[in-house]
Design a protein with these regions (language model features):
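Generic beta-strand/beta-sheet core signal
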Residues: 2-5, 33, 48-54, 81, ...
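Solvent-exposed loop/turn segments at secondary-structure junctions
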Residues: 6-10, 25, 56-58, 78, ...
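A generic secondary-structure signal for well-formed alpha-helical elements
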Residues: 42-46, 99, 103, 108-115, ...
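Conserved catalytic neighborhood of penicillin-recognizing serine enzymes
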Residues: 45-104, 130, 172-203
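Mid-domain, small-residue-enriched loop/turn segments at the edges of structured enzyme/sensor domains
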Residues: 64-68, 100-147
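Active-site SXXK
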Residues: 25-51, 83, 149-154, 197
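Secondary-structure capping and boundary motifs in well-ordered enzyme cores
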Residues: 22-28, 72-76, 80, 84, ...
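A penicillin-recognizing enzyme superfamily signal
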Residues: 1-22, 140-205
Length: 205
């Protein structure tokens, strides 16, 4: 599948917005993958766990205030389900801080996010094992296909299936050259945790 943009077509097989050709900051859409899914899957939190939505600072020497979408707005104690429903930033950062950013990073790897930057491969000192990962602040962003396949894993009872562009390649005589008919899969979330995450996401609607 090729997904283009606006303007006149000037090249063939150039920029494909559906694939890894382009990546953008995911923002709050990363929260279920890096924060709430891991929080439920590790058993550290439940949908009813209380988190205090109050002024909170990132750790480190350059500690900055974590802001919600509406700056200066704090809702006090709220459940994880409520924090997910209204997409509050402070609870998400607090939860990831307790889990540790490394845990969130590891889950994103399992969800098939291919653009992650590890501390070992930092770009000008920037990497993704940081608290701001909870809010989608990523060094290289995320591609559409990675996000789609990650969310598909949630819909598939926590099982990730590596996306493919074709199932088979045949030669002129019908012989199979490449066979992708059996996809690569692995478990990311256990089914109970995945069910809870889906219930939380349904509250958003």
């Amino acid at each position: 599948v090729m997904v283009g943009g606006r303007g006149d077509k000037t090249l063939n097989r150039s920029l494909n917005r559906a694939s890894n050709d382009i990546a953008r900051q995911p923002g709050s859409s990363i929260k279920p993958l890096a924060v709430y899914g891991p929080a439920l899957d590790t058993g550290t939190y439940s949908l009813a766990s209380a988190i205090d939505d109050a002024p909170y600072y990132y750790s480190g020497t350059d500690a900055k205030l974590v802001t919600n979408f509406t700056k200066g707005e704090y809702r006090g104690l709220m459940t994880l389900r409520e924090a997910l429903t209204v997409s509050q930033n402070v609870p998400a950062v607090k939860i990831l801080s307790k889990l540790t950013p490394q845990v969130g990073y590891n889950y994103l790897e399992k969800f098939g996010i291919s653009t992650l930057v590890s501390p070992k491969n930092a770009i000008n000192g920037a990497h993704d094992v940081v608290q701001s990962l909870a809010l989608g602040g990523m060094t290289r962003g995320v591609s559409n296909i990675d996000m789609c396949s990650a969310y598909a894993a949630i819909a598939n009872k926590g099982t990730y299936t590596k996306p493919i562009y074709y199932t088979k390649v045949l030669d002129s005589e019908g012989n199979i050259i490449i066979d992708n008919s059996v996809p690569e899969t692995h478990k990311v979330l256990n089914e109970n945790s995945d069910w809870l995450l889906i219930q939380g996401l349904r509250s958003v609607a």
